[in-house]
Amino acid sequence: MIKNAFISFQEQKEESRGSVEFQVFSFTNKIRRLTSHLELHRKDYLSQRGLRKILGKRQRLLAYLSKKNRVRYKELINQLNIRELKTR
């Protein structure tokens, strides 16, 4: 449901599904699914590892987007209700 809404939103903007925004959106959906799974299955260590890998990928994509286009980064963060990256 949510994914289809975002895909139609992206098609209106004429951006491909390989765009950074769509990748971050799909990683966020996977992260939310895995988080709810891990609340029930605390000792599922393979899922924990997968979650950490996806978090790292999303973090790298968000860092790239914040360097290249700060406005699109801010819009995406607000749309997905996720926190900003920590700067070193």
Curated annotation (Swiss-Prot):
GO terms for cellular component: chloroplast; ribonucleoprotein complex; ribosome. It is found in: Plastid, Chloroplast. Its main location: plastid. Keywords: Chloroplast, Plastid, Ribonucleoprotein, Ribosomal protein. Pfam families: Ribosomal_S15. GO terms for biological process: translation. It comes from the Eukaryota. GO terms for molecular function: structural constituent of ribosome. InterPro entries: Ribosomal_uS15, Ribosomal_uS15_bac-type, uS15_NS1_RNA-bd_sf. NCBIfam families: S15_bact. HAMAP family: Ribosomal_uS15_B. Belongs to the universal ribosomal protein uS15 family. Part of the 30S ribosomal subunit. This is Small ribosomal subunit protein uS15c. It comes from Olimarabidopsis pumila. The lineage of its organism: Eukaryota, Viridiplantae, Streptophyta, Embryophyta, Tracheophyta.
